């Protein structure tokens, strides 16, 4: 499989960001590691490429991928880790140069909840870009 150049470039940039900027609460995890988030990042970019998503949608997917499991407290169900990751993302954006995207916040906040609730929250977005493809 040949990985498209745009996917490679986005992956390298966001992987570097993940390694340098995103701190994980559960440092001794065997499952939910930076490597796990890097795999999610790669698969998200490959799917986004196949779907023909816009740059803005790809950037949102990348941000969600690198932050989504950063605030886990255990490797099991850990209901609430999505909201904690969303809050971490929001706080990070406030104090750094990463632009905040409410769709990214919602994708993470509902990451460990019923999909129907997350899809409903994203549907309420009025940005002209479907959040459903990000969820």
Protein language model regions, located:
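Divalent metal-dependent catalytic cores for phosphoryl transfer on phosphate-bearing substrates
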Residues: 57-135
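Acidic/His-rich, divalent-metal-binding segments that scaffold phosphate/diphosphate chemistry
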Residues: 1-78, 82
């Amino acid at each position: 499989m040949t990985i498209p150049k745009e996917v490679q470039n986005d992956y390298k940039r966001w992987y570097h960001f993940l390694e340098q900027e995103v701190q994980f609460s559960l440092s001794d995890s065997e499952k939910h590691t930076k490597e796990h988030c890097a795999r999610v990042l790669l698969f998200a970019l490959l799917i986004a490429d196949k779907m023909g998503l816009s740059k803005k949608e790809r950037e949102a997917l990348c941000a969600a991928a690198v932050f989504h499991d950063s605030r886990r407290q255990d490797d099991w169900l850990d209901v609430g880790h999505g909201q904690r990751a969303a809050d971490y993302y929001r706080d990070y954006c406030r104090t750094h140069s990463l632009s905040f995207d409410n769709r990214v916040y919602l994708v993470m906040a509902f990451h460990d909840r019923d999909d129907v609730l997350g899809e409903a929250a994203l549907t309420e977005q009025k940005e002209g870009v479907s959040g459903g493809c990000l969820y």
